[in-house]
Amino acid sequence: MKARWLGFVSIALLALVSCSTVDPVTGKRVQNMYLIQDDIQMGREVIADTVATMRKEGVRINKDAEQVAKLQTMVRRITAVSHMPDLPYQVTLFETNIVNAFAAPGGQMGVFTGLYHPEMGLVKDDDELAAVIAHEVAHVTCRHTTEALTRGMPLQLVLLGASIYAEAKGKQDLAMGLAAGFLVYQGLVLPKFSRADESEADSVGLMYMAKAGYDPNAAIRIWERAAARGKDPKLFAMFSSHPTDSARASALRKLLPKAMAEYERARDNSSRP
């Protein structure tokens, strides 16, 4: 049984190592065992589960025509200049004071109304809202979720295989503990983007918003404002795994000349008859 278990893990890990693909944004080879269609299906399931969970908590879907139209227009403009313009992008607006936005694989995104307010919000104008949307679109096009799932697969396989082996040997307590560890790891570690993922989404998103005709200075304003607010608990959900706000503003400022050139080019093109 031990030999069989080791064989199972070895074969699975070998398959994982061989699942190299080309990153659609950087052009580099990366490990991702999922197809684009997997991303799309996973994203639909994630947004459906999120909507169901939110409704149980009393959070409704905001269907205000003006607000929804604004978001949809931003998504169309930004995704049109992205590396994956043909994905079935969709944005859902949740009516809640939570300060957050998120991206699921395959083009699904969620925005919480607590993020945007002209006076009190972290995001105060359309350019700043576009910066958030572009950041989330970048997570989608960089395929950060399924890359993270792939990176976490070796430990998942070890935990799962060890659980199967322990159960076969009659060690039920150990099997249950390992199975619980597998579920905790799968549910609590994998969905979070790494700081490297967040930094990449910042830089890619900055170029997306600029190419779409939104002022890239807005992205820097957001992180400077967040840094000034310090450890506001309302912001914790959005930034718990992100680089520090001041570091993000500094990194984006270095990219600003290139982004401004794209922004001016987009404005020139839009003004032509």
Per-segment meaning from a language model:
Residues 1-19:
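Sec-dependent bacterial lipoprotein signal peptides
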